[in-house]
């Protein structure tokens, strides 16, 4: 289900969700997503991951509902574990993750986008968590990630009342960061990923970790202590020296990743 390619000398990975007609997730597809993120985590050259759907209509329609047709609790538990594990891996990735929402992002498809750091939607995109309408609930982090982005009220409208959100509304409520023309989400996400790749790799990784502390409700005093430690930790790398030297020398910095030798 995951079609992977790389651009910019491997700095940016592009994962396409490809399972016609609606790019719906199966257990195997979720396992593949988790394994893909794990492999990219082990590749220090990768600075960002762009995820999009194959075709012009669907980012992903979420779970294949045929999986739950028999009402088997064992299947439900296995799939909930798969969804949770895959999207937790995506959320906790070392690199920056960007969802290029090229169409419908429904149920687990929207949860996949919610697990990413940033989201860009095309003007025709539609987003929803309609699981309660078929007797299910979001089990891929959605009940936790959505309120963080849009607040409790909108999260309840989307989940409890089954409200579908268009791209303009998603931008207004903070569900996505940008809205672009039809067919332009992947290129816009790549442009944002290139911005990420120009930053210090260690500073970005530490900053992502620190923002995650706020999201998880870590007490402010504890999070600020970690913030100070991570600032000092940067000086165990070459990034501060290179960054300041590049700024003063009016040139682009040449960053080193953990897989390369620091100066």
Question: What kind of region is each of these model predictions?
Answer:
Residues 1-12, 44, 56, 162-168, ...:
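C-terminal alpha-helix plus adjacent terminal tail
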Residues 1-52, 88:
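Conserved CoA-thioester-binding segment of acyl-CoA-metabolizing enzymes
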Residues 31-32, 53-89, 105, 133-135, ...:
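Glycine- (often His-adjacent) and acidic-residue-rich active-site loop
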Residues 89-204, 233, 237-238, 242-245, ...:
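Crotonase-fold acyl-CoA enzyme core
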């Amino acid at each position: 289900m995951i079609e992977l390619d790389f651009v910019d000398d491997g700095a940016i990975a592009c994962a396409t969700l490809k399972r016609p007609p609606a790019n719906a997730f199966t257990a195997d597809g979720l396992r593949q997503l988790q394994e893909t993120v794990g492999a990219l985590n082990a590749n220090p050259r990768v600075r960002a991951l762009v995820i999009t759907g194959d075709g012009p209509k669907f980012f992903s329609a979420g779970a294949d509902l045929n999986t739950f047709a028999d009402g088997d609790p064992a299947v439900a538990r296995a799939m909930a574990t798969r969804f949770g594990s895959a999207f937790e891996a995506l959320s906790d990735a070392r690199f920056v993750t960007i969802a290029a929402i090229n169409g419908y992002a429904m149920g687990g498809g929207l949860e996949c986008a919610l697990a990413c750091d940033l989201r860009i939607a095309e003007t025709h995109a539609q987003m929803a968590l309609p699981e309660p309408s078929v007797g299910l609930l979001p089990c891929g982090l959605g009940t936790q990630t959505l309120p963080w982005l849009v607040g409790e009220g909108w999260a309840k409208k989307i989940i409890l009342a089954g409200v579908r959100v268009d791209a303009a509304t998603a931008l207004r409520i903070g569900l996505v960061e940008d809205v672009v023309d039809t067919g332009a989400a992947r290129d816009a996400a790549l442009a944002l990923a290139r911005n990420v790749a120009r930053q210090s790799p260690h500073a970005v990784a530490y900053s992502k970790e620190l923002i995650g502390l706020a999201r998880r409700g870590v007490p402010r005093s504890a999070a600020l202590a970690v913030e100070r430690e991570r600032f000092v930790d940067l000086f165990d790398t070459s990034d501060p020296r290179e960054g300041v030297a590049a700024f003063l020398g009016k040139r682009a910095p040449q960053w080193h990743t953990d897989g390369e030798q620091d100066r």
